[in-house]
Each structure stands twice: as C-alpha cells, then as structure tokens.
Amino acid sequence: KQEWFKNTLFVITADHTSISSNVKYQNALLKYSIPIILYDPQLPIPKLLNTPMQQIDIMPSVLDLIGYNKKFYSLGNSFLQSNINKTVVQYADGIYQIANDSIVLQYNGEKILGAYSYKTDTAMVTNFAERVEPDNFLLKKLQAYIQLHHYGMVNNKMICND
C-alpha cells in the first residue's frame, strides 16, 4: 500500500448502464440502476444502503464524508442524511421521472402519465396516475427540481451565493 492510500476516499461508479437480461432491471426506473461505491480505508465495516441514490448525490456525500462544512450548491443530497425523503430524478424522451423508496411518477411537464408501485409491481403495469392528487409531494418535488434546474441553467446561477 502507498502512503496516500489511507487518506483517500475512492468513488467508484458507472456513468450509465447497459440493457440487462434480468427482468427486474427492465422497467422504466430500474433500467437506470448503477453501482455507487464510496470506499474509505479508515471507515469501519462497509454497509449496503438500499435507498434511492443518484449520481448527483455523490458530491454532497463525499463532502459530508470528508467533513466539509461550507456552503455548496447541489440538487443532490448526502446519503448520510437519514432525515430527508430520498428521491431520484431522471429525464428521457420528453418524460421526467421521480421515485422514492416505493413509488415512481412519470410526468411530461403538464400532467402525470404514470404512477407505479415499482417494488410490488416490478413490470410497472398497474398505472394509478389518475388517482394521484395535483398536490402530491413527489409531483411537487419533481416540479421544484425542474424549476431549479431550468432557472439555474438559464440564469447561470448554479452556484451558492454567500
């Protein structure tokens, strides 16, 4: 081992996934699943987190792990924060998608196209979009993500103001 090894936090992940032969990963949500491994040789026994996490959560997680306590801008959240409602957001083919630990909503910017209990309905065939209220927490969170992202990009404001 090199001297620097003990002072290094290793981040191992994929930038995308390929088509899986496992049917579990062939639905509109789980087809985006990739491994994210944060390895610190000085931390105790590793643990597996079975919670929604996405690539934009890597930076806040790394900053949390190294004890960074200054302001920073991120649409992601540290996986160390257990007090937040963790979600993942994707956009593909004109459809926004947000999921928490059990539900996924699909939204075209105007209306909900799909709502599925992906943990129990892994093929995502039972769509209950018509029963989702307009003030649904996940929908509001998705709309906030979209608004924050678009505002930040248009106004070049994806920074933390002091």
Label the predicted regions.
Residues 1-162:
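Solvent-exposed soluble domains appended to multi-pass membrane proteins
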